[in-house]
Amino acid sequence: MCPILMGQGTDKVEKTTEKRITIDPLTRLEGHGKIEIFLDDDGNVANAYWQVPELRGFEKFCIGRSVDELNKLTSRLCGVCPGAHHICSTKALDHVFGVDPPETAKKLRELFYMAHYVHSHIAHFYALAAADFVLGPGAPKAERNILGVVGAVGLEIGGEVIKNRSYAQKIQEMLGGKATHPVIGIPGGVAKSINEDERAKIEAMAKSCVEFGKFTNQLFADVVLKNQDYLNLIVNKDVYYHETYYLGTVDKNGKNNFYDGDQVMISPTGEEVARYREGGRDYLKYIAEHTLPWSYEKFCYFKPVGWKGLVDGKDSGIYRATPLSRLNVTKGFTTPLAQAEFEKYHGTFRDLGVKGPVHFTMATHWARVIEMLYAAERLLELSQDPEITGKHVRNPVKEAGEGVGILEAPRGTLVHHYVADKNGITTDVNLVVGTTNNNGPMNLSVRKAATALIKNWMVSDGLLNAVEMAYRAYDPCNSCATHTLPGQMPMDAVIRRADGSVYKTVSRNC
């Protein structure tokens, strides 16, 4: 076992007598989830499950609404990634109404979206993931949080984290009316243009975000890559490793693009096996969703291979759509600093003997901070574009119909698919969100980590946190992912007295 995953400091490994270990609630993720680990008679892991016990149901209650409301409604899917849903939904509405936005509008949307990426990746790396690396997997539970990270790295760095994330939020607010649940997008364009004063303010904040992106990549190099234990953790095939298919979006030159481009699926050995056409409108040729009775979250798979269960490898249709996936699919970045980090990333793994895609789940964290830097650089580029203050920001729409919007959300490839009648009323909605793409892989990762770490009845808080690290790398957003109802919805209403005791429990199963 990788030494850093063994008992650290006050983390005490003890023998359990339980054959069922439940981690509930899970920590440092968006939404609710739990992990169930089942031990065999020898105290080793027989199976483990990543479960999402919450339901949101957005697909159903979008039906019957005016279709042009959906980019405002679906942004309520989540308070962490409303920008991704809003922009993707707006792209779907362009298609629904048969309109292509002006170039200035496209650039303003992307400008907004790059700020969203910066905010999201900063939030995940520093608030959710960093504690596992800065403090260590086995650090005391009470310290494994953002306050513990700030205590370890210092108030000055903590201040920079808060400042630059707030800059990203302020840019979204300036462009979108508000940072959370924005209203920038309308079918055929954007709601408003920006003036030179606003552009200059955005440029100044973008410059700070670029510097912070550079700092974050250097911090990752110093804290993680230069620590042999952490490097061993990343490249440990026994704990955090799966050979899967990968999905990502690239531009016409094969370079990374979050807002627009072709969606490309590659095999575990790196060959291109599918490319979405017509703006992703043929996505249903390539991906499908499977349901299992123990989760409200669907399981995506690569349709030409098919659903073979929760197994990895070339013969399984399970694929990943994450920052790791995007760096496997893309030929590089269009911005210089991110491209330099991209070359360092792949060069490091080549030196470690990796040929083809990088399959190490923990490398997703490295990929994410590289993407943060790219988003900041692209944010700066767009803020300096002479066309960004143009006044032609909307084209007229046509009669409503059917439309698909697709882009790269921070957590993976996102699809919004709407059908409307001639009156513009929504008759069907399909959402394939980043986390749904990764539901199968997260289950695989949790099971593999648990199997590798829990042996002979021996368990500790640090080891269970190391199991949680398996899903944390994916940055799951469970509010987004549990948007539909695959089966029944059991519900308990618990009525309590003033002293907290239970007076009555009313159950239903419908």
Task: Label every PLM stretch briefly.
Residues 2-411, 433-510:
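Active-site bordering "gate/hinge" segments
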Residues 410, 417-437:
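Low-complexity, glycine/alanine/valine/leucine- and proline-rich hydrophobic stretches
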